A protein has these predicted regions:
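Non-globular, low-confidence helical/coil segments that flank catalytic cores
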Residues: 2-299
């Protein structure tokens, strides 16, 4: 018997078996990394995406319908689409453009080209930017139902209530009119509310009146002091506050006044600059990644 030939034969078999094992382990790891999005029971899931300096948030409702609020800047579009597909999102039932700034709608074209969309809500503020024109063109081309809801409008998606708090009317003559005409939403499941302030500033806030209490607050305008302050935080009394901003951004977000106010009221702060995270609620209790609380791990 030629020992060399036998050893060569077994070496080939070993390489084949090792390759198959590696493929199997890779597939298993890929499967395990993917959250069991559709199998968590009667709960609402909220994802705050890390899109750099911008906003993008996903709700997966107990009935498996989805709400995507904003899509971040254009350069984050591919990453956002990958994240949505990783979460096994097949359709966006409600796509919300809170206002036409590029850090909120820059990624919309990629979303619209990768997912069917049930309907679109828009703030109604005409900015005239190429991003907004492309967004409107894609909606029209796909013949997607389109609305510009105002304060007082509400809809139910299964057991979830979506309330429009603003805009109440068109606001002109401010430093940032687009921000002061944002779609501001309160999304409620059971006794848990998510107050989504977009980039609302003081002028728009004055049209709303007292803000509702909410367990989760998406702080206005990336943690800018012209959107979130102590009086607002005392009105809302959130347990969790989300600050959506990019690492080392040129605007200095979040402003120190906001960071101090959040700390003073004792709320837990979660920042998107540290990466995408998920909050889950059964309508009463909130679950969030404790390790992501600001102040931990150098955050």
């Amino acid at each position: 018997m030629n020992i060399g030939i036998v050893m060569k034969k077994y070496r080939k078999i070993f390489i084949m078996l090792f390759t198959l094992l590696a493929i199997s382990l890779t597939a298993a790891a890929s499967w395990m990394e993917k959250p069991a999005v559709r199998d968590i029971g009667d709960k609402i899931q909220f994802y705050a995406f890390d899109v750099g300096q911008g906003d993008s948030f996903l709700f997966i409702l107990p009935n498996n319908e989805t709400i995507l609020i904003d899509a971040g800047p254009e350069e984050a579009g591919r990453k956002l689409v990958r994240e949505l597909k990783r979460l096994d999102v097949k359709k966006i039932d409600l796509l919300v453009a809170t206002h036409p700034h590029s850090d909120h709608i820059g990624g919309m074209s990629r979303v619209l080209s990768n997912f069917p969309v049930g309907k679109v809500w828009d703030s109604g503020f005409i900015h005239g930017s190429p991003y907004q024109k492309n967004f409107y063109s894609a909606i029209q081309k796909k013949n997607i139902p389109f609305g510009r809801p105002k304060r007082g409008h509400s809809e139910n998606m299964g057991k979830v209530l979506i309330e429009v708090l603003a805009p109440a009317r068109l606001i002109r003559g401010t430093k940032r009119d687009a921000n002061n005409n944002c779609l501001v939403l309160n999304i409620t499941y059971g006794s848990t509310s998510f107050l989504m302030l977009a980039d609302m500033e003081r002028e728009e806030r004055s049209t709303i009146g007292p803000l509702p209490g909410a367990a989760v607050l998406k702080a206005s305008h990336h943690g800018s002091s012209n959107g979130t302050d102590m009086s607002l935080l005392k009105e809302v009394r959130p347990s969790l506050i989300i600050l959506s901003y990019g690492r080392n951004n040129s605007y200095g977000y979040p402003h120190l006044e906001v960071v101090g106010a959040v700390s003073a009221i004792g709320a837990i702060r979660l920042d998107t600059k540290d990466g995408t995270f998920r909050i889950v609620s059964d309508g009463e209790k909130l679950m969030w990644p404790k390790e992501r609380e600001a102040g931990k791990n150098g955050g």
